[in-house]
From Swiss-Prot:
Keywords: Activator, DNA-binding, Early protein, Host cytoplasm, Host nucleus, Host-virus interaction, Inhibition of host innate immune response by virus, Metal-binding, Modulation of host cell apoptosis by virus, Transcription, Transcription regulation, Viral immunoevasion, Zinc, Zinc-finger. It is found in: Host cytoplasm; Host nucleus. Its main location: host cell. The gene is E6. This is Protein E6. It comes from Human papillomavirus 15. A zinc finger (unnamed) spans 27-64, 101-137.
Amino acid sequence: MDRPKPFSVQQLADTLCIPLVDILLPCRFCQRFLTYIELVSLNRKGLQLIWTEEDFVFACCSSCAFATAQFEFSNFYEQSVCSWEIEIVEQKPVGDIIIRCKFCLKKLDLIEKLDICYKEEQFHKVRRNWKGLCRHCRAIE
């Protein structure tokens, strides 16, 4: 029976019994190797590794994640809702809704979601997924 493939960079490092700093992962889109900071960021953002049928593993670098987010927002935008309205649309609490940053694709934590609701900002539905603004991208916007 095949061993399950790791979904995160940390799981990959643990599976291979090597330190995270020694992981060399190419970006699926630009083929550049991710830096150590990008590897750590990939874990923090909750992004998964990309596996091919031939068992090659790839990731997505920060530049390509940003470009992908912009492309999807421009081409697959569906709707926007104001703060708490997302709970009405989804029929569940905002804490239970998966929302990613519209710029860096980080999975938003509860504080970031509540901050958007408190400030009465908008959530955007893009390609059947909700987007908001993470604290890091908010600080540099």
